[in-house]
């Protein structure tokens, strides 16, 4: 029970920090937020409850959507949908902000992932992104132990691949 409380507290603190860091705290209540890879909706609920945002969470997992709906009070402006992050069913510029935490590492096409998030973001909107990345492995080759860890993440945990922050930045700047 103690560890669960610590995890929840850390999750809430993390969301508040990412909101401040990304500028989402400048948005008015009622702003439309897309939570890409929402899981069971933890971040979505915090964004709706503490900031008054209207949050749409998407995940490819029907089980996660079901659980997110079970955990979310009808008083919160949150809705959850089963949807592929690489094929978002929203019009261009629908959202004031796009939020994505630890989803990109699961995407096999990082360019399409970025394209879809940026396409649904209104001009001048905010992108809040926190994810697993690797350093530039050509410039800074991994140690033997790091190679083993990467192998485990890619093969046993079935992550498609990791890219560096620099590589992801290039994708974003291409827009």
Predicted regions and their residues:
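Acceptor-substrate binding/catalytic loop of class I
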Residues: 150-167
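A short SAM/SAH-binding and catalytic strip from SAM-dependent methyltransferases
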Residues: 97-109
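Conserved alpha-helix/loop element of class I SAM-dependent methyltransferases that forms part
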Residues: 9-29
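A short acidic, Gly/Pro-enriched loop at the edge of an enzyme's catalytic core
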Residues: 86-98
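Short, small-residue-biased leader/transition segments that mark boundaries at the very start
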Residues: 1-6
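Conserved class I S-adenosyl-L-methionine
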Residues: 128-150
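A short glycine-rich, Lys/Arg-flanked "PGG" loop and its adjoining helix->strand segment in the class I
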Residues: 111-126
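Class I SAM-dependent methyltransferase SAM/SAH-binding core
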Residues: 32-34, 40-87
């Amino acid at each position: 029970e103690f560890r669960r409380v610590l995890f929840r507290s850390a999750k809430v603190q993390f969301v508040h920090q990412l909101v401040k860091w990304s500028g989402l705290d400048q948005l008015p209540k009622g702003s439309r937020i897309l939570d890409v890879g929402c899981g069971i909706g933890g971040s979505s609920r915090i964004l709706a409850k503490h900031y008054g945002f209207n949050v749409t969470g998407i995940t490819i997992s029907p089980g996660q959507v079901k659980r997110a709906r079970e955990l979310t009070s009808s008083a919160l402006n949150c809705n959850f949908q089963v949807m592929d992050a690489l094929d978002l069913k929203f019009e261009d510029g629908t959202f004031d902000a796009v939020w994505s935490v630890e989803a990109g590492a699961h995407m096999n096409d990082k360019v399409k992932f970025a394209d879809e998030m940026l396409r649904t973001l209104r001009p001048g909107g905010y992108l809040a992104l926190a994810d697993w990345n690797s350093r530039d492995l050509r410039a800074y080759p991994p140690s033997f132990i790091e190679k083993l860890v990467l192998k485990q993440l890619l093969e046993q945990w079935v992550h498609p691949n990791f890219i560096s922050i620099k590589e992801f930045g290039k994708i974003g700047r291409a827009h």
